[in-house]
């Protein structure tokens, strides 16, 4: 009896402990935690994760969740009031109840022989039977988040409000609004089979999201987190309530801020983001929601995302209906939308047909050359996007008179003025070019046509020598002969292989044999003509071309020194580049790209800026090569959706792999990486002990923040007294501005030249990848809804798929970057 008495005294204490935190992950039957109980939780063995109640945004409500670091939910059961509880019942069912006793959520495992629960070090919450076999798991029943080591298989769905994310059987990743409208459809590269049997998605410890399946050896890499490479970082993939899918990460596995490093889509392209009749646009930093005009009011002025409502319903118009014109605005639709239809019509008929039809509430006229007109019928959900580069005008039926927003009237006037200015500039440039060609032909006719020196040359070679700007057309046999059957290989890249050749007039040339070029004869010649019309000191000159049968070749001037990478990354002391050479190469390259972007008749986006495509002449002046081989952009809209983009990982801007439009700012990003390599002498994607196993660009920014810029400098230059540290600082600052995640945070190449030359003061740059505008702090999450783009990966590849299926009135969408920050923000006043 003396032995039993102490045990009986301890029994109440043991029972009490069932209601309080455990040191181990095992959770016995009968355990309970209360919403009102401070510090009550069921922790994982390493205390990284815990099951607990965290405050909800709604007042006096709490979310029952598995949390990271005690405050960041990665799985949730639901929300209850302060008297709610989460209990593992003796029946084996895990149940969340409100203070009134109402069941909010139930695991429905009361007949599965559950004997205990457990929260693992991976963040998985499981219920076990008497054989320690899981019968229920939070990983198998995800809510809005996927963590590392969690397998997300086809058929599972993440949900957040009206939005959902799922992995299709085909391997595609989709984001949907209200289960019907697919506004993001990210597919596998066409080289993979679309007939997958059981694909699974996984967020790897290095920050790469991959799809695995028996038919995919090694898996297919889908997207990269902006801080990929560091396996000591905790990351998770979350569907936020704004409809965007983001990758978050924390540098600490136990605490600290959680930042977003990638998001799936431009925020204004999220279907329904601004509610019914809401129009999404941007201010300097964030997406904003507005009504189409003053004929509408906000449903809730305190929450503009709830949409708008008509001040006067169409049924009360008494025949006084008219059309509200919204320029540069696109109302969204989706595939198989039952409340919309399309046909071919011009802008005026598209507007008039809708006005006269009782079944039409709005229409959209595409001004992208397609001639499409889309009509929205009663029952439609109206959600749209407005930005100056959007190639469409939307018409919304309203009760007259139209009361337009001030911003819309100003935009329309500015648009008309800009069109007039563009016409004036275009006519002047064309007239100047025609005059120059006429003078050159006249000079040749008068002075050179009878010169015997040209007697043995064909008319093509005569044109080569004396009519600069007109490319010479070679036959395939001529180029085969001058390269000795393509014997001496100079290099290879994403567009083909380069060979050394000697023309009959003894001119040494570089002959590029193009691969994967599918354009027809006429289109190829037009692009060659455009490339050959570009003349700049820092561009490699195109001499001629061959377009014969399936053969497509380009002939360039020859650079004996080869490309920049031969000097920058070599250990050969004979090829060492002094600081003066490096700075001049950086400046020359910037000037060459500026010419392509801002001074050509057509904006030429290079799409593959890297050291291998920067050649060095005998005087070590930079010559940019391979420009114009990607699609030329419309000067009125320098955005382009590429279905098979080419580039080199490590230099690709985040928007490439995020399926967002490619612009001239994508070249700026690539140039920024090259700039950092010129300073450091190291590849931007190098990971080593010196960089603490971080990507070099991220490590370099951390050293810059510490004021240790000299650590970034090439060690071979560290003892060189001739190094201009002011130039080093300008190059480093400029490089970090160039590699900002958001395209409009990056400077134009014209600004880059000014920054390098010291014409303008450069403000300290923002962290290019490690600091995000979406972050968790304490128990709450704050977001500016800035879209975080995917980062380029550490290895090279020549081709990526960039197809997109989200349709905006039937046309593939091409929205702008989500964060609208003025380029002036990086420059001093």
From Swiss-Prot:
Its GO CC terms are: plasma membrane
Could you tell me which InterPro entries the record lists for this protein?
Answer: Bulb-type_lectin_dom (IPR001480), Bulb-type_lectin_dom_sf (IPR036426), Kinase-like_dom_sf (IPR011009), Prot_kinase_dom (IPR000719), Protein_kinase_ATP_BS (IPR017441), S_locus_glycoprot_dom (IPR000858), Ser/Thr_kinase_AS (IPR008271), SRK-like_kinase (IPR024171)
Principal place of residence: membrane
Highest taxon, organism lineage: Eukaryota
Q: Identify the glycosylated residues.
A: 46, 98, 130, 151, 172, 178, 189, 195, 283, 320, 416
**SMART domains in alphabetical order:** B_lectin, S_TKc
EGF-like domain span: 264-301
Localization recorded for this chain is: Cell membrane
The record places the following residue ranges in the Extracellular compartment, namely 26-421
User: What SUPFAM superfamilies does this protein's entry cite?
Assistant: alpha-D-mannose-specific plant lectins (SSF51110), Protein kinase-like (PK-like) (SSF56112)
Q: Which UniProt keywords apply?
A: ATP-binding, Cell membrane, Disulfide bond, EGF-like domain, Glycoprotein, Kinase, Lectin, Membrane, Nucleotide-binding, Phosphoprotein, Receptor, Repeat, Serine/threonine-protein kinase, Signal, Transferase, Transmembrane, Transmembrane helix
Q: Which PANTHER family match?
A: OS07G0415500 PROTEIN (PTHR47974), RECEPTOR-LIKE SERINE_THREONINE-PROTEIN KINASE (PTHR47974:SF9)
Q: What is this protein called?
A: G-type lectin S-receptor-like serine/threonine-protein kinase At1g34300
From which organism does this entry originate?
A: Arabidopsis thaliana (Mouse-ear cress)
Q: What is the lineage of its organism?
A: Eukaryota, Viridiplantae, Streptophyta, Embryophyta, Tracheophyta
């Amino acid at each position: 009896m003396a032995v039993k008495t102490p045990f009986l005294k301890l029994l109440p204490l043991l029972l009490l402990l069932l209601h309080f935190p455990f040191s181990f992950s095992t959770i016995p039957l009968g355990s309970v935690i209360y919403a009102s109980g401070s510090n009550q939780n069921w922790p994982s063995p390493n205390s990284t994760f815990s099951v607990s109640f965290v405050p909800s945004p709604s007042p006096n409500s709490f979310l029952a969740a598995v949390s990271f670091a005690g405050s960041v939910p990665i799985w949730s059961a639901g929300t209850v009031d302060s008297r709610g509880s989460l209990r593992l019942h003796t029946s084996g069912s895990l149940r969340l109840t409100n203070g009134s006793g109402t069941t909010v959520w139930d695991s429905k495992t009361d007949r599965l022989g559950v004997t205990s629960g457990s929260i693992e070090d991976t963040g998985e919450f499981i219920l076990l039977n008497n054989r320690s076999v899981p019968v229920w798991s939070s990983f198998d029943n995800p809510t809005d988040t996927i963590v590392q080591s969690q397998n997300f298989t086809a058929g599972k769905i993440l949900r957040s409000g009206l939005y959902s994310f799922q992995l299709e059987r085909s391997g595609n990743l989709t984001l949907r609004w209200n289960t019907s409208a697919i506004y993001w459809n990210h597919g596998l590269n066409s080289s993979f089979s679309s007939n997958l049997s059981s694909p699974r998605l996984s967020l790897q410890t290095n920050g790469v999201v991959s799809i695995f399946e028996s038919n995919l050896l090694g898996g297919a890499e889908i997207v990269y987190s902006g801080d990929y490479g560091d396996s000591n970082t905790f990351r998770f993939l979350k569907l936020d309530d704004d409809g965007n899918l983001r990758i978050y990460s924390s540098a600490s596995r136990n605490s600290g801020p959680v930042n977003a490093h990638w998001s799936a889509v431009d925020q204004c392209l999220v279907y329904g983001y601004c509610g019914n009749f809401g129009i999404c646009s941007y201010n300097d930093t964030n997406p904003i929601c507005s009504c189409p005009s003053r004929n509408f009011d906000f449903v809730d002025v305190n929450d503009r995302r709830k949409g708008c409502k008509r001040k006067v319903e169409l049924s009360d118009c008494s025949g006084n209906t008219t059309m509200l014109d919204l320029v540069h605005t696109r109302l969204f639709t989706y595939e198989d939308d039952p409340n919309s239809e399309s046909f071919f019509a011009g802008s005026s008929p598209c507007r008039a047909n809708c006005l006269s039809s009782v079944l039409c509430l709005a229409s959209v006229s595409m001004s992208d050359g397609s001639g499409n007109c889309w009509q929205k019928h009663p029952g439609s959900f109206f959600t749209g996007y407005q930005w100056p580069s959007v190639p469409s005008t939307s018409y919304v039926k309203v009760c007259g008179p139209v009361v337009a927003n001030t911003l819309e009237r100003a935009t329309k006037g500015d648009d008309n003025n800009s069109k007039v200015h563009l016409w004036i500039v275009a006519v002047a440039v064309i007239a100047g070019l025609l005059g120059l060609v006429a003078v050159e032909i006249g000079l040749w006719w008068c002075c050179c046509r009878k010169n015997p020196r040209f007697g043995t040359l064909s008319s093509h070679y005569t044109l080569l020598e004396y009519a600069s700007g007109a490319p010479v057309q070679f036959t395939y046999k001529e180029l085969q002969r001058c390269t000795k059957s393509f014997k001496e290989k100079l290099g290879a890249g994403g567009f083909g292989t380069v060979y050394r050749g000697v023309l009959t007039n003894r001119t040494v040339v570089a002959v590029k044999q193009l691969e994967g070029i599918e354009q027809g004869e006429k289109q190829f010649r037009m692009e060659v003509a455009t490339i050959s019309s570009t003349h700049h000191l820092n561009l490699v000159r195109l001499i001629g071309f061959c377009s014969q049968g399936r053969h497509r070749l380009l002939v360039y001037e020859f650079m004996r020194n080869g490309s920049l990478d031969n000097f920058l990354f070599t250990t050969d002391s004979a090829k060492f580049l002094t600081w003066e050479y490096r700075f001049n190469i950086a400046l020359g390259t910037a000037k060459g790209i500026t010419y392509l972007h801002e001074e050509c008749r057509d904006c030429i986006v290079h799409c593959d800026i890297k050291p291998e495509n920067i050649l060095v002449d005998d005087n070590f002046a930079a010559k940019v090569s391979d420009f114009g081989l990607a699609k030329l952009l419309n000067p009125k809209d320098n955005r382009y959706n590429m279905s098979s983009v080419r580039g080199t990982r490590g230099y690709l801007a985040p928007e490439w792999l995020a399926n967002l439009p490619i612009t001239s700012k994508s070249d700026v990003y690539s140039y920024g990486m090259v700039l950092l390599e010129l300073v450091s002498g190291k590849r931007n994607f190098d990971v080593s002990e010196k960089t603490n196993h971080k990507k070099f660009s991220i490590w370099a920014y951390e050293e810059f923040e510490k004021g240790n810029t000299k650590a970034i400098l090439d060690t071979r230059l560290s003892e060189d007294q001739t190094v201009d540290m002011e130039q080093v600082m300008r190059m480093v600052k400029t490089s970090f501005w160039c590699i900002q995640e958001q395209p409009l945070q990056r400077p134009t190449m014209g600004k880059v030249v000014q920054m390098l030359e010291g014409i303008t003061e450069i403000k300290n740059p923002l962290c290019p990848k490690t600091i995000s505008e979406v972050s968790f702090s304490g128990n709450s999450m704050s977001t500016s809804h800035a879209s975080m783009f995917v980062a380029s990966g550490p290895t090279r590849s020549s081709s990526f798929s960039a197809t997109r299926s989200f349709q905006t009135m039937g046309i593939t969408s091409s929205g702008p970057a989500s964060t609208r920050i003025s380029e002036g923000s990086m420059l001093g006043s």
